[in-house]
């Protein structure tokens, strides 16, 4: 689950990190009043969406007057912001962040992720702040400095000092950086984060460090024990189909192709998408129905897949391990009858009671195309999607 910038900065402030004075506003009038409370001559106004590239898309501006801030809010609130990280429809803007402008002398990068290889939280810092860190990692990896956090002892001050030295910080800036580093390390573990970024972490003209931006992603599997963060969830930023799928414990990710995929197991789902691509098709989604593929969940899965108008055919690829293929077949038949599926459906069953499941599908009288192998299934669904 992602947080908005203003929410990330609220958490930063709770852990004693320096953030600009700012206010999240729901209406143009609130933005006008917030601008009046900010003492700096210039005010920064930012659209709050779960996407990067806001500045280039016109979603971040600098204004001298309260009226200019209000006009910006009137322009964007209730509209969709399209950036290079969104689809063509963009994401809805329901809040505007109004905050004080800063005198920037230097921009740094500070972030942390869970590194699965080392099984550690790993901090990354760079002197190249304010730009795409992935580009820096690819072109000049030597500019990224890392510190792995031992889960038994947590972040250590000496690690923060080492990073500060490598970033060229001096004097009191080192103490400030260590405080930020320690706060972020504790926050990462306490709130079950998957990723956090401050890009840029700026050195102001006065010589102080300031968290100018904030990005936080929380491990969705840990949300059950993070009630405070659950309240920060903004469903308007999610794909409606993905939100619907989550209610049924279906793992769904919308893609741009024309072949709907329904599979049990994430690994098999990725393999299915790969082989569809290999045979010239384009998957319309990733959908893992999991081990408990009941009729109800299969029905909802069909509804979600078919809510995408680009879907021209559906591939159902089920491996019966714990779940029996004949029960899956009953679910598919019931779902197709209930939903009224009009596009071709290709089904490949393998494993526990697969012959019985295939027999049930064949005797159903429905327009279901059977396949005995994954290659055959991919070939048939690609042909069906092309109308062949």
From Swiss-Prot:
SUPFAM superfamilies: Glutathione synthetase ATP-binding domain-like, Succinyl-CoA synthetase domains. The keyword Magnesium applies. ATP binds at residues 46, 53-55, 99, 102, 107. Its EC number is 6.2.1.5. Pathway: Carbohydrate metabolism; tricarboxylic acid cycle; succinate from succinyl-CoA (ligase route): step 1/1. InterPro entries: ATP-grasp, ATP-grasp_succ-CoA_synth-type, ATP_grasp_subdomain_1, Succ-CoA_synthase_bsu_CS, SUCC_ACL_C, Succ_CoA_ligase-like_bsu, Succinyl-CoA_synth-like. Mg(2+) binds at residues 199, 213. GO terms for cellular component: cytosol; succinate-CoA ligase complex. Gene3D superfamilies: ATP-grasp fold, A domain, ATP-grasp fold, B domain, Succinyl-CoA synthetase domains. Keywords: ATP-binding, Ligase, Magnesium, Metal-binding, Nucleotide-binding, Tricarboxylic acid cycle. Substrate binds at residues 264, 321-323. Residues 9-244 form the ATP-grasp domain. It catalyses: succinate + ATP + CoA = succinyl-CoA + ADP + phosphate; GTP + succinate + CoA = succinyl-CoA + GDP + phosphate. Binds 1 Mg(2+) ion per subunit. It is an enzyme of class 6 (ligase). One of its GO terms (molecular function) is magnesium ion binding. Its cofactor is Mg(2+). GO terms for biological process: succinyl-CoA metabolic process; tricarboxylic acid cycle. Succinyl-CoA synthetase functions in the citric acid cycle (TCA), coupling the hydrolysis of succinyl-CoA to the synthesis of either ATP or GTP and thus represents the only step of substrate-level phosphorylation in the TCA. The beta subunit provides nucleotide specificity of the enzyme and binds the substrate succinate, while the binding sites for coenzyme A and phosphate are found in the alpha subunit. Heterotetramer of two alpha and two beta subunits. HAMAP family: Succ_CoA_beta. Belongs to the succinate/malate CoA ligase beta subunit family. PANTHER family: SUCCINATE--COA LIGASE [GDP-FORMING] SUBUNIT BETA, MITOCHONDRIAL (PTHR11815:SF10), SUCCINYL-COA SYNTHETASE BETA CHAIN (PTHR11815). This is Succinate--CoA ligase [ADP-forming] subunit beta. It comes from Aliivibrio fischeri (strain ATCC 700601 / ES114). The gene is sucC.
